[in-house]
């Protein structure tokens, strides 16, 4: 449906003609706002009707605007609905319904544009001439417009929680705490009963949601501010709003020492902290307080365990065990070891006449025999024949049992590990981490998660990543 340029385009909007939105919902559309001198420019009126049509049927005169509208449809579907009709915003003291027509429509258009200015998915305005004009009725930044500064600022501040909450899944930066906007009872009472009844239920539901969000946000900010890890977060909500495409992002704060309450998340904890905090503490043997003790039996001054005899005197571990088992003092002179059976002088086998054997045995008559002859006789009850005699002693390689193998292998592994720990420097020393943790100081102090604790940064960052402070406009471009 084509409309003449001089005719107001919003007069022929199909939503109004088909009575999808009754006049009682927007009383300003059916009364004294028909004069062309009081109407807004066509571009701003398109924006106004874009938020009126919640069914997704906006009116645009040319296909270029329609294609641009399609790109905003997913985010528009999340932001339309109940939040577009808030009586306490539209009936604020600076924006009455029944006063001048331009102020009311400006507030509605600014009400529509405010989610895009605070959403992380923000793009350039659909109508640059309307949104970018300095001092015009529509302004991207709160309080920048000349005539409706208070109204646009309040609408932007009231919609900040919803927009920031919708984008919190992708950007974990905590949003700026919203300003509480309470409806003015005098101006609200002066409004038409039809409009207040139409949007009253929606406004009450949204007020409850807004109060819940503000309470939860304040509690989370208190928790983060009181945490020893991030004491600097308590002052984040008081930062002034900057003129920026994404005002929910806080201003750039360098990673200073006061932002980190614990050395675990501060780069200085890795770089300048003592290396002993990461090195395994070698347990030094605790010196016992018994340096002056001495064993009354052998005179030893060092022993793994001090014992006492019957009279209370100190004994070393060896003398104490001997006294306990034998009931007498441990002899100081070691007894001479008995010569092994293989070295007995003058002993020979009664069967094969050999003088060397690993073990001397005795036959039934009591005569000494070598190990081979004694075993043969024990098994066969017959003397071992002399033809089986060999010059050398045949021995066999006994296989170690599995238990002894495991114990020996475990001991060897433990020794190797202890040697490696002593020889090599610890892997988490300050010198080893100095090269890897250098770019951490350029990172913003906020993590990309919604939790209280920040996400630990990787120790080995990729060389392709840029650790400079990213400009939010480039991030929005990448999102698009």
From Swiss-Prot:
Disordered: annotated span: 166-208, 457-480
GO molecular function: C2H2 zinc finger domain binding; chromatin binding; DNA binding; DNA-binding transcription activator activity, RNA polymerase II-specific; RNA polymerase II cis-regulatory region sequence-specific DNA binding; RNA polymerase II-specific DNA-binding transcription factor binding; transcription coactivator binding; zinc ion binding
Subcellular location: Nucleus
Organism superkingdom: Eukaryota
Keyword tags: Activator, DNA-binding, Isopeptide bond, Metal-binding, Methylation, Nucleus, Phagocytosis, Phosphoprotein, Repeat, Transcription, Transcription regulation, Ubl conjugation, Zinc, Zinc-finger
Positions of modified residues (Phosphoserine): 73, 192
Biased composition (Low complexity): 183-201
Cross-referenced SUPFAM superfamilies: Glucocorticoid receptor-like (DNA-binding domain)
Function: Transcriptional activator which regulates endothelin-1 gene expression in endothelial cells. Binds to the consensus sequence 5'-AGATAG-3'.
Subunit structure of this chain's protein: Interacts with BRD3. Interacts with AR and CCAR1. Interacts with MDFIC.
Protein name: Endothelial transcription factor GATA-2
Organism of this sequence: Mus musculus (Mouse)
